[in-house]
Amino acid sequence: MTENNNKEFTEGNILWKNVATASSFNKKEQQVFNVNKNEILIAKIGDEFKAMQSRCPHAGLSMLGSQMNSEKDLIFCKWHNTSFCYKDGKVDKWVDVPPYQKKLVKFFALFSKKLKQMVEMPETPIDIFRTQVIEENVWVGIEVAN
């Protein structure tokens, strides 16, 4: 373990960054932090902290404030009815919208290259990051090249 200061340390190929006090999550259960060019959403779920990429891969919109289901370990993107497992990042449901909405979007995609890419985008999991609490501080771990 290599300690740089009280804000970060390395452990193998993991760079650990101190992002917040655990008590700060009592008022705001979800918070977003920029860690080594990664925008990370950390959510307090019970007594645990889960960290994941903060933006849905479908359209790049923020998942801050999205509903969490602790029984199924899911976060639900509030924009396109997509859900992900917050433990492993796998897709649970991908753009689960009614058929008429899909047809409407496909029609408009004929006129927009960007919209066409979003409509045709394959299921994409979210990145998951490690967390730990040390002396009442929440730390997030990022893999770095050796």
PLM regions: where:
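N-terminal pre-ligand scaffold of iron-sulfur
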Residues: 1-74, 86, 104-146
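Short metal-binding segments enriched for Cys and/or His
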Residues: 83-93
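Short cysteine/histidine-rich metal-coordination sites, predominantly Zn2+-binding motifs
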Residues: 70-78, 91-101
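Glycine-rich His-Gly loop
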Residues: 54, 80-81
